[in-house]
Amino acid sequence: MKQTLFDKIWNTHVVAGEPGEAQLIYVDLHLIHEVTSPQPFDGLRSTKRQLRRPDLTFATMDHNVPTKDIFNIEDQMSRLQMDTLVKNAQEFGVPLASIGDDKQGIVHVVGPERGLTQPGKVIVCGDSHTATHGAFGAIAFGIGTSEVEHVMATQTIWQVKPKTMGIKVTGEMPKNTYAKDIIMAIIAEHGVSFGTGYAIEFYGETIEALSMAARMTLCNMSIEAGSKTGMVKPDQTTFDYIAGREFAPKKFDSAKAYWSQFYTDDETAFDEIITFDVSHLKPMVTWGTNPGMATAVDQILPEIRDDNDRAAYDYIGLEPGIPVTDIPLDYIFIGSCTNSRYEDLAIAAAMMKGQHLAPNITAWIVPGSRAIRNRAIATSIAKIFEAAGCEWREPGCSACLAMNPDKIPAGKHVASTSNRNFIGRQGAGSRTHLASPAMVAAAGIAGHFVDITEI
C-alpha cells in the first residue's frame, strides 16, 4: 500500500491505539518558551512527576522579549513569565537559551538553526506555528497547555491521525516573488480553512528549488490554511542545511540514509490534491483581517461579498476599488518566525541598499535569533538597514503579536512579514498588511506598496 511522507513518520511513532481512533504518538523533540510552559511545570510539581526526557526538551525566550532594550522588562507579567522559565529550566534540567544568550531567539528559528529540527521526527511546541519545522520532513504541530504537560510527563501525545493533502506547486518563480507569495496566494484562492483535518505536504519542481528558509515560510503558514501540519520531503537541500550544526548527528551519512526513506511513494497516496502554478504569480498583500483576505499588488481591493468583508473593511479603514499601491502605510516590520532568517534579511537589505525610508515610515527590523543578528552585523546587512533609517533590534517575536513592547499604535497601517493580520494582532486597533520581506522593504522606501516585479 502506497504511503505519504506523513504516513511513514506517523506509523513509526505510534505507541498505542488503533487506526481510526486517537493514537498515542511518541515525541522526539519538545520545544518550549516562556508563555505556555509555566502551568505545565506547575502540573508536574503538583503531581510529583519529573520531566520524562529533559534531553529531548529545549527552551528559549521569545514572545515577551523586549527587542529595543532586552534587559529592561517593564511589563510585570512578561518579567514573571521569563523569570519563571529560568527557575523551571533549572529545576527540571531543561537547556535554556535566555535573554542575552548567543543561542536565544524565536523558537521556530533557533530549533532549525541549532540542528535540533531533523527529518523523520515528531516535533511539538505550545505555539501554533510549530508547523514551520515540517519543512525538514518532520511532523510538527502546535499543542495546548494541557498537552504540553502530557508531553513533559510522558514524552507522548494523544492525536487522531489526519487525512493527507498534497499541494503540488509547479512553474518557474517570476522575478521578485517568494515563498511568502506562494502560500498567501494559495490561501487567498482556497480560504483559511481548506486544510482543516489534513496534514499538508508541499511538493513539485518549484518546491524542490526552494531554499530551506523559503520552505520554512511555506510550512509556517500552513496553520493559516487550517492545517496543523505542513511538510516538505527531505532532500539534499535539507541535508546540506543540517550538516555541521550543533545537534547534527555525528554519524551523518547514516542519518542521511535513514532520512532518505521519508518521502511520499506516489501522489495517489494523498487523500486530496491541490495544484498551483507559480508562472504568473505576483507579490501578494493582505487587505483585511485574515490571511485569506489578500490580493496581488497590481490589483484593486475586491468588492464586498459578505458581512465578514464589510467588517474587515470597517476595521482596516479601507474601501473596495482602492489600488493596493494606494494603501496608506505608517510602519514596516521585518521579523517573526515566518520571515526573520538571514536570507529574509538579505533580501530586504538588497531592496533598501543605498536608499532611505520614506518620511511617513517607521521601520523595525528584528532578526529571528542572536546568531542571525550577529551574522547580519558581520556582513554589514545591519548597516544597510541603519543607513536607511530603520531601527535594528534584538531578537524576539517582537511586533508579530502584542505581547511585548513592540506594538503598532491604534489606527496605524503596518506592512509586516509576519503571519497573521487578525484584529488587534500587532496592537489594539493596529491595521496589518502581510507581505514578503522584499515587498515590505520596498514599501518602506516608497512609503507605500509597489510592484517589485517591475523594479
Curated annotation (Swiss-Prot):
One of its GO terms (molecular function) is metal ion binding. It holds the Pfam family Aconitase. Its cofactor is [4Fe-4S] cluster. GO terms for biological process: L-leucine biosynthetic process. [4Fe-4S] cluster binds at residues 337, 397, 400. It catalyses: (2R,3S)-3-isopropylmalate = (2S)-2-isopropylmalate. Keywords: 4Fe-4S, Amino-acid biosynthesis, Branched-chain amino acid biosynthesis, Iron, Iron-sulfur, Leucine biosynthesis, Lyase, Metal-binding. Its EC number is 4.2.1.33. Pathway: Amino-acid biosynthesis; L-leucine biosynthesis; L-leucine from 3-methyl-2-oxobutanoate: step 2/4. Binds 1 [4Fe-4S] cluster per subunit. The keyword Protein transport does not apply. InterPro entries: 3-IsopropMal_deHydase_lsu (IPR004430), Acnase/IPM_dHydase_lsu_aba_1/3 (IPR015931), Acoase/IPM_deHydtase_lsu_aba (IPR001030), Aconitase_4Fe-4S_BS (IPR018136), Aconitase_4Fe-4S_dom (IPR036008), IPM_dehydratase_rel_enz (IPR050067), IPMI_cat (IPR033941). It is an enzyme of class 4 (lyase). Belongs to the aconitase/IPM isomerase family. LeuC type 1 subfamily. Catalyzes the isomerization between 2-isopropylmalate and 3-isopropylmalate, via the formation of 2-isopropylmaleate. This is 3-isopropylmalate dehydratase large subunit. It comes from Leuconostoc citreum (strain KM20). The gene is leuC.
